[in-house]
């Protein structure tokens, strides 16, 4: 299992993802923000008292942060590659970083 890092870093990452999700509305007014803040404050000092395993809540928060980040990246990739309909061969080649060869003029190519 990879190292979890600090709980504060995980908390800030969750808040960042909430800001991305909400866009225009204030993320501090959402129920998700209030719940996350409450859980981090409740388990701030006595983390092992409420958890069966050491750092269980921190692990769950890190896993949820990974999920939110992955969903956001998936949506960005989906918008970039699947939301444009039919594309020309030049556009498709450009998506993967290639260029089509130039067609020479003259007999046989017209």
Swiss-Prot record:
Keyword terms of this UniProt record: Mitochondrion
Naturally occurring in which organism (per UniProt): Xenopus tropicalis
One GO location term (cellular component): mitochondrion
Family, similarity comment: Belongs to the FMC1 family.
Superkingdom as given in the UniProt entry: Eukaryota
Chain spans, region Disordered: 88-110
Extent of Low complexity compositional bias: 94-104
Cross-referenced CDD domains: Complex1_LYR_FMC1
Name of the protein: Protein FMC1 homolog
Role this protein plays: Plays a role in the assembly/stability of the mitochondrial membrane ATP synthase (F(1)F(0) ATP synthase or Complex V).
């Amino acid at each position: 299992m990879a190292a979890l890092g600090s709980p504060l870093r995980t908390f800030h990452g969750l808040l960042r993802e909430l800001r991305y999700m909400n866009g225009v509305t204030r993320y501090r007014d959402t129920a998700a923000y209030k719940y996350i803040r409450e859980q981090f404050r409740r388990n701030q000092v006595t983390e092992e008292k409420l958890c069966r395993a050491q750092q269980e809540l921190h692990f769950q928060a890190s896993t949820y942060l990974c999920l939110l980040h992955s969903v956001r990246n998936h949506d960005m990739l989906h918008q970039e590659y699947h939301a444009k309909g039919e594309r020309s061969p030049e556009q498709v080649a450009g998506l993967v970083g290639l260029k089509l060869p130039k067609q020479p003029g003259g007999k046989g190519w017209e």
